[in-house]
């Protein structure tokens, strides 16, 4: 057959590329079902975030932070307390089975099991259901964790001595202490330093003696008879030492 013989041209078989302009979808066709991410959805997110941010800034301005005195690593009477979101773990470490020789159990094993269960939760419950009563494993683990954290936090708050914690962290005035004074030597020899601090700044066991506002006779009476948590008979010195101690404390004032 010669070239072209017996063939008939019927038209162009190529498919033309139809170019359409990139027109955004008209969301009015689906009222209440969908919307544009920008700016409709994102603007709502920003507005909610702005409300929380402004509220947080107002709280930081209105309420002063609960600052305590400068940390002193030599103060063995200070009882530290974690922030509220760690109170449940703080309370857990108080129990016999999670403290002492079992500290590893309370500090490592139990939290490790809890976080391990949290990581395994997506693999333990792979269902497509969204109703809580049809997801017993995930919902049960969540309720158990929340209940335990709430109970331990409540126990920690209820059993903690907040008045003592406030007293031990109170910011006290500084004073120039003459460590060569006879009154300070008596103060140190009689063991007053263990409760009231080496600079008379006070602590968890005793109040600050700086700017006490007490007269020497009042100080002598307290040293002999005691007051509040201070028992009687703590002072073991003679009358001269008592006089020096009372004079020293009454004259100790802040800068």
From Swiss-Prot:
Membrane-spanning intervals of the chain: 46-62, 104-124, 137-157
Gene3D superfamilies for the chain: Cytochrome Bc1 Complex, Chain C, Cytochrome c-like domain
Q: Which InterPro entries match?
A: Cyt_b/b6_C, Cyt_b/b6_C_sf, Cyt_c-like_dom, Cyt_c-like_dom_sf, Cytb/b6-like_sf, Cytochrome_c550/c551-like, MenaQ_cyt_c_Rdtase_cyt_b/c-su
Major place of residence: membrane
Which keywords accompany this UniProt record? Cell membrane, Electron transport, Heme, Iron, Membrane, Metal-binding, Transmembrane, Transmembrane helix, Transport
Q: State its cofactor.
A: heme c
What membrane topology does the annotation report for this chain? Multi-pass membrane protein
Q: Which Gene Ontology molecular-function terms are recorded?
A: electron transfer activity; heme binding; iron ion binding; oxidoreductase activity
SUPFAM superfamilies for the chain: a domain/subunit of cytochrome bc1 complex (Ubiquinol-cytochrome c reductase), Cytochrome c
Q: Name one Pfam family in it.
A: Cytochrome_CBB3
- Biological function: Component of the menaquinol:cytochrome c reductase complex.
**Sequence similarity:** Belongs to the cytochrome b family.
Quaternary structure, per UniProt, is: The main subunits of the menaquinol:cytochrome c complex are a Rieske-type iron-sulfur protein (QcrA), a cytochrome b (QcrB) and a cytochrome c (QcrC).
* Protein name (Swiss-Prot/TrEMBL): Menaquinol:cytochrome c reductase cytochrome c subunit
This chain's source organism reads Bacillus subtilis (strain 168)
């Amino acid at each position: 057959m010669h070239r072209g013989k017996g063939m008939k041209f019927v038209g162009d078989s190529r498919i033309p590329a139809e170019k359409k302009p990139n027109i955004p979808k008209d969301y009015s066709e689906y009222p209440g079902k969908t919307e544009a991410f920008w700016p409709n959805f994102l603007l709502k997110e920003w507005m909610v975030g702005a409300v929380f941010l402004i509220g947080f800034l107002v709280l930081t301005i209105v309420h002063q932070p609960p600052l305590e005195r400068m940390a002193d690593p030599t103060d063995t009477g200070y009882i530290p307390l974690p922030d509220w979101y760690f109170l449940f773990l703080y309370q857990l470490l108080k129990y016999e089975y999670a403290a002492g020789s079992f500290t590893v159990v309370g500090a490592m094993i139990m939290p490790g099991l809890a976080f391990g269960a949290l990581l395994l939760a997506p693999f333990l419950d792979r269902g497509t259901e969204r109703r809580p009563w049809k997801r017993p494993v995930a919902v049960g683990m969540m309720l158990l964790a929340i209940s335990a954290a709430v109970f331990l936090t409540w126990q920690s708050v209820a059993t903690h001595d907040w008045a003592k914690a406030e007293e031990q962290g109170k910011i006290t005035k500084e004073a120039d202490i003459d460590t060569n004074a006879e009154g300070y030597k008596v103060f140190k020899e009689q063991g007053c330093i263990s409760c009231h601090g080496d600079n008379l700044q006070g602590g968890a066991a005793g109040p600050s003696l700086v700017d006490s506002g007490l007269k020497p006779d009042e100080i002598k009476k307290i040293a002999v008879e005691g007051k509040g948590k201070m028992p009687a008979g703590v002072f073991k010195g003679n009358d001269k030492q008592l006089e020096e101690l009372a004079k020293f404390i009454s004259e100790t004032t802040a800068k």
